[in-house]
């Protein structure tokens, strides 16, 4: 008997179907994507991913990427403004329009995890940022701008723990 799909698999399947309903030619223009008859190609953290035009499946050198990667791509296609343009300014997560409901989860999952993993390990964090194609920033003990997509960067500003403060 075939096992039921996980909630994650169901969410990906729903979004895959949404992708198939999107105007792919409009996505190519909007995000300046490479494309051919079979696929669209998008660069995500310096890796070129393939999105099959017929079935909407996303692959990274033939392997399906994880849930977060797939959802970031589908959500970017679906929710981006009609004419997305970077402001050129780096802003705190809480200052991004319409993210307030997600800030607690962001702190709990992303921020606390970064603090836990990289506290006392600045060299490792710098290496990870460089592997992701990051460019150094002068702020923090480790500061980098990371290219999520060619049209969207994020900044990681990390201060290591010391005798007065926890890592942040």
Q: What does each model-identified segment do?
A:
Residues 47-72, 159-168:
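Intrinsically disordered, low-complexity regulatory segments enriched in Ser/Thr/Pro
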Residues 37-48:
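N-terminal accessory interaction module
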Residues 65, 84, 101, 136-138, ...:
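Proline-rich intrinsically disordered, low-complexity coils
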Residues 1-38, 69, 78-133:
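Short Lys/Arg-enriched alpha/beta "domain-start" segment
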Residues 119-168:
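Conserved binding-pocket/active-site segment within a compact domain
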Residues 24, 75-79, 107, 136-149:
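Short charge-dense sequence patches
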Residues 31-38, 52-55, 136-140:
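Short, ordered beta-strand-loop transition motifs
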Residues 63, 112-115, 142, 146:
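Short, charged/polar micro-motifs that form catalytic or ligand-binding hotspots
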């Amino acid at each position: 008997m075939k096992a039921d799909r996980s909630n994650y698999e169901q969410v990906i399947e729903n979004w895959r179907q949404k992708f198939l309903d999107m105007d792919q030619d409009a996505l190519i223009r909007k995000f300046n994507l490479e494309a051919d008859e079979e696929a669209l190609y998008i660069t995500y953290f310096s890796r070129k991913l393939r999105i099959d035009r017929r079935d909407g499946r996303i692959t990274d050198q033939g392997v399906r990427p994880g849930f977060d990667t797939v959802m970031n791509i589908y959500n970017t296609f679906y929710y981006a403004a009609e004419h997305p343009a970077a402001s050129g300014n780096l802003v705190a997560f809480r200052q991004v329009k319409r993210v307030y409901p997600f800030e607690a989860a962001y702190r709990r999952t992303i921020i606390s995890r970064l603090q836990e993993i990289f506290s006392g390990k600045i060299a490792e964090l710098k290496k990870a940022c460089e592997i992701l194609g990051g460019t150094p920033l002068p702020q923090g003990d480790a500061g980098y701008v990371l290219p999520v997509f060619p049209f969207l960067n994020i900044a990681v500003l990390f201060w290591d723990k010391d005798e007065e403060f926890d890592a942040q």
